[in-house]
Every structure is written in structure tokens, then in C-alpha cells.
Amino acid sequence: MPTPSAQLDQGIISSNGGTSGVSASSTRFRHRKISVKQKLRVYKASDLKDLDQDELQQRELQEIETGVEKNEEREVHLHKILQKNQLQLQDLYIPTPDASRVWKEFDEMYQGRFTTPASYIQFSVQLEDCCGPAYNMDERDEAYLAELNGGESEALTEDEFELLMTNFESAIRERQPFLAMDPESLLMYEDLKPTMLKNDIGDAGLKTELAAELQLGDQPFVTKFDSPATLRTRNMVELIEKYGAEVYEYWKKRKVEVAGGSIIPSLKAERSTDKDDNDPYFCFRRREVRQTRKTRRVDTQNSQKLRLLYQQLQYTKELALLVAKREKMSMDMLLRDREIFQLRCDIKTVKRGLGIKGEDELLISQKRRKLVSNVITNKKYVSTQADAAALRRLRVAKVKDKKLLSKQLSSTDLKRQQSQLQKLDQQQRQQQQQQQPQINGAQCQQDGSGVSHVYVKLPTSKIPDIVLEDVDKVLSMKERNTKRFVEEKMKKRREEDGDIFFNLTDDPYNPVFEITIPQNISPTNAPFSSIVSSNFEISRSYYTPNLQNCITGNTNSVLAYNKEGEIVESQKYKKIEFYSPFEEKNDSHTREIPVRFRRRLGRYGVEYIDRKDVSRNPSDLLGEFMDFSLIAEQEQSSDAVNVYDSQLDELFRLHDKWKYDSDHNAYGIKFSDEPSRLNQISNETQVIRFGTMLGTKSYEQLREATLKYRQNVMAQRKKLVNAQRQQQQQQQEQQEQEHQQA
């Protein structure tokens, strides 16, 4: 009696008695229960001897990798070729299009020759798909456009026609998204017109928005990638008013032909309802891939990454707009300078023609002063204002709390409560006074650690979003603070010394020497340095009392005394040389050297010294930096002037800076580039690291101040609550005592 096969689970048995075979995508075999609804094949006794061998061959065949995707192995032609019994046949093949023929009309349709450029051909498919209209014309559109124009002077171009068709598609997609259910219910042109006027087709709306942000006015927004054809495209409002009604009828006809679908050519993709695997026009087929399980932690990380990416893109957009605005401003400045130059050229010709002679200051561009950013001063002002406001709110809250307590408590309880509060305040003040030295020491340690460890690597979570400052600004601020500190220290020391000490180290004066120069050395060529003059013989040295009278100019007579205290009479000098950094205000400062001297030799070796007065030039270069009239007014006035507001002191600092300061060191490298060179990183990275360190420090200080403020507020609230509870307990105890006495 024939028995059914033991391997019934290898495939589904068809209605005609034949099995479809084991699925090519499955290499595992699982025994299933025999179902009553399935048809089973019945084998005869003669088939049993070859049954096991066929089963093994079939398993071996399906375990071999075919090199074809598992979903594609079910295709009809591939399935026939991959069958066991069809491997030996020679007439089986996969149908492919015939590419051996030559298209005769190729030269007529495609003209022109391609020349290989010098550089690579650069393109971006994703970006080009988003630029311009999405609709592409075909042969029918070309014939209709030729009929529509009909030899008009202002004909509708192909680009404008594609813009109109794209606008119609966008408007109907927005107003009737389910038009495919009923294609005949298409809206009229009057209903679609308002939506079409609002739509942003292509990049026209984006360019208009960018032009408004950059304040270009009526100028067109032209980029480097715009072709000349796009620049000649008319406005959408004008196209709709002139050609909208006629193009609507043609578009409506095309829309009805495709049963309400999209008339824009697109690739055919498999939808969720389509399951036809044999359709060769499907470009992409869906795959049923099992989705991996995700935890909330992964979702949170992904959302944070997306949020950070969006923020970075916003920063990039703002940065690009700022760069564009800056370049536009620089271009406007160049154009204005060019106009000014042309006007100056015209003025020259006019003055020459009229014979006008005068100053030429208008023909020379004056130097502009460098603008100084006041970001640091604004930050300090905002922080001080915030601290003052917080203290004011705290005081108002204390006053309100005291008023509430005074209303609720009786007179005796109020006195008792006030005494308790006074004791608590005294204790807090004592604790604060005891803790103040510790806090100051901790702050000094923090400052020292911040100075010694400037560059600290922080995690991204602790880096706040701040505006980075330039290294030059930070270094200049540091240098100004150092100079101010030194000046304050010197001023303080001078005030402490007064008239008691005469400090020769801080206020040196040149001693009066009579140097005997050897006869073989010319006095005109003798060096005047202290090292070389030590080789010469010094005859006598003197000291002079009452130097202040001589310095201030109250006396012209100078008395010199030798070491025995005797007055030495000498006609070689009338006034000693001196130098005092604290008495420089008493000297006369001019814009330029008042006189010039020239030494020349005459006959018989006679030396002559010629003096020449310097003519005053109204367009003095120093006048661009300093206002000498303001300095004179400030010095002549009797009002006390702050040391930081003194114009004369600013002139001294400017002179010293011009004389001694240098932006480069001995090796020719900028001082601002030294830290980056020391750390072996780029200067931009050094700027970011330094700014991050400053921002982190300020952020931590603000956080600590906020926490201290919150702790103080919570402590005050707790004190208030405890005082109220004590008051309630005392009232209850008094009531209980009264009840007991009653």
C-alpha cells in the first residue's frame, strides 16, 4: 500500500497534484502537522527507491548560493533556470533588451560635441532636483506651446510654461489631495487662482526672502549657479494673469487623462496595495524587514542628535547670512569710494579750469578710527544691575514678611519674636565674619588655579553657548589691566612717601658730572652711554639741593656742592638734566619739535649750528589721534581730573606705546600666535579653547551665585515657618493654661 512521503513539509501541494517546491529563501526544515485541508501526493512502490535520493539532491541544490537576491529568485525565467531538471538545457535564457541595433535618428536628435573640461564635472542630484520647476515638457506640451504663442512678440517660454504647470500641480495637491477618487470633480480656475498666487514654486520665493533679509531692494538675487535663461523668467503673478486661464484648460485635459494622478513624470514604485512581483516597470519594491526594537534611551539620543544638528544648521544659516551682509556692505563701501574718487577727479579738473588754489584736504581720504567693542563693559553692567535687583527683591521680601508677622502677633509676642530675630541676625553676622577669610582664601586659590591651568578640556555637556572673543582683545585687556595695576601701585607708593623720602630708584635724576675726555678722542664722536663713559676719568661729581625749585622752573640759578660741602662755581651748565616719571606733567608738550638744528663744518674746521623753526601744519598727523585743545583746557581748569580720564596721561601712554610697544617679538611671530604654537594647535582652535575656558568659568560662577541665593531664600523661608510654628505652640500653651485655671 502506498504511503505518503515523510517530508510533506517541503512545500505547499497545489491543486493539480504537484508541489511548488521548497522555498528558495528557506534552508531550514521544520516538521508540521498534517492538515485535513491539504492535498497530499501518493507515491507508488516503484517511486520509493528514488525518493530519498531525489530529496537529498533537492536539498543540496537549494543550499547552493545562486548570487541572486532571494526575492528575485521567484521571477519566472530565473525560477526555470534554477530548477534541477533544467540545468542541462541550452535554450533557456533571461530576456534582455536588444542593444545591438543602431538608432538612425540619433544624430538628428542629439547634436553638438562634448569637450572634456579641465576639471572634474561637479553636480549634486539631490540639490538639482530641488531647484527649478518639477515639471518637464514632452512632445505634446511642445506642440501646444507653439500653438499657444502663435507668433506673438512676448511669447511664453518653455521655462515659464513648466513653472505654470508645476504651480497647477502644487495647488491641486494642496486643495484636492484625493482627486484620484473622483477625477471629474476638478476645481475651477477661479478657485485655484488664490492658492497659485501664494505658492512658492522653485526657488523664486526663497530668492525673494533672501533678498529681503539682505536688504537688496529691487535688485535681483543672482547666484553663481543661475543660468541666463532663469534671469529672463517673468514674475508668477504676471504669468498667471496673462496665460493662467488658457494653460488651465490644457492642464485639466491632461489631468483627466491620467485619472486625477500626477502628470509630472516620475519613477514607478511599488505601493502598499500592489503585490505584483512580475511587473518589470517597478523600480523599487518593498521589503518586509523586521524592525529592530529600540529603547527609549536610543530615541532620546537620536532626538538630541537631531536637535543639535538642527541648531548647528541654524547657526550655519545665520553665519552665511551675516557673511553675505558683510560682503554686501564692503561692496557698497567700494562703490561709494569709487564714486568719491570720480567726484574728486572732477573737482580737480574744475579747480584747474577756474584757477582755484587752496587746501586739498577734501581730495585725500582720512584715516578711520578703529571701533572698540563694548561687550565686556556691557556684561559687567548687566551683572551689576542683576545683583542689585536681586538684593532689592530680597529686602522687599524681608519687609513684607516682617509686616505679616507684625499683623499676626500681639504686642508681647511681637517683642519676644523681634528679640529672637535680632539674636539670629547677630549669630548669622558672626558666622559670616568668621567664614569670610576662608571664602577669600578659596577664591584666591581658585584664581591661582585658573591662572596656572588655563587650558582645561571640558565635556560637551558643560560647554555653554557663548560668543567667543578674539585673543587680541583678551590680551589687550590683560595688558591694560596690568598697566593700570602698576600705575595705581606707583601712585599709592608716592602718596605714602610724601615729602619724607626722596626715592632715587623710582624718581632718578641724572647726576652732574664733569668728564675729562682724552685728547685723542673727539668730543663730538664720544659715546654717551654709561658703560663706555666709565672708561673716562671723572674729575668731580656734585649734588644739588632744592631740586624741585629747579625742576618746576622757579629759579634759574643752580648751585653745585662738592663732597666737602663747598660751593663749586662753574659756567658749564645753567640747569641740570633730570628725568622724573611723576613730574612729566610739568613739562611742555608740543605736537612736534619746536626747532630743528643742523651741525656743519666751515672753513678752517669751524663748526656752525644752524637753527630752523618748524612751521605749523594744520593737517598734523597727531591731530587725528589726540585733541590738543582738549588737553590744554583740561590742564588749565581747576577741577580735579580722574587719572583714567586725563587726556594728558593718555598722551603719555600713547607716546610710550608708540616708542616701546611692538606687535612682534624678536623672531617675527605675533604674540597672539605664541600660545597656539606652544600647544601645537591652530590659532582658531586656540581661540575656541580660550573662549570656552572663559565662558565655563563665568557660567560656574553664575551657577554658584544662583545656588547661594536659592539657599539663602530657602533658609529665610524655613526661619519664617519655624517662627510661625513656635508662635502657634505658644498660643496653644497659653490657651491650655487659661482653660486649666478656669
UniProtKB/Swiss-Prot annotation:
Answer whether the UniProt record assigns the keyword Transcription to this protein. Answer: yes
Q: Where does it mainly reside?
A: nucleus
Q: What does the UniProt entry say about where the protein is found?
A: Nucleus
GO terms for CC?
NuA4 histone acetyltransferase complex; nucleosome; nucleus; piccolo histone acetyltransferase complex
Q: Its domain of life?
A: Eukaryota
A GO biological process of this protein is:
regulation of transcription by RNA polymerase II
* Keywords on record: Cell cycle, DNA damage, DNA repair, Nucleus, Transcription, Transcription regulation
> Which regions are flagged for Low complexity bias?
724-734
Q: Where is this region: Disordered?
A: 1-28, 416-446, 718-742
Molecular function (Gene Ontology), one example: histone acetyltransferase activity
Give start-end positions of Polar residues composition bias: 1-27
State whether it acts alone or in a complex, and with which partners, per the record.
Answer: Component of the NuA4 histone acetyltransferase complex.
Q: Which family does it belong to?
A: Belongs to the enhancer of polycomb family.
Q: What does this protein do?
A: Component of the NuA4 histone acetyltransferase complex which is involved in transcriptional activation of selected genes principally by acetylation of nucleosomal histone H4 and H2A. The NuA4 complex is also involved in DNA repair. Involved in gene silencing by neighboring heterochromatin, blockage of the silencing spreading along the chromosome, and required for cell cycle progression through G2/M.
The protein's matches in PANTHER family, at most eight in alphabetical order, are given as: ENHANCER OF POLYCOMB
Q: What is this protein called?
A: Enhancer of polycomb-like protein 1
This protein's species is Eremothecium gossypii (strain ATCC 10895 / CBS 109.51 / FGSC 9923 / NRRL Y-1056) (Yeast)
Classification lineage:
Eukaryota, Fungi, Dikarya, Ascomycota, Saccharomycotina
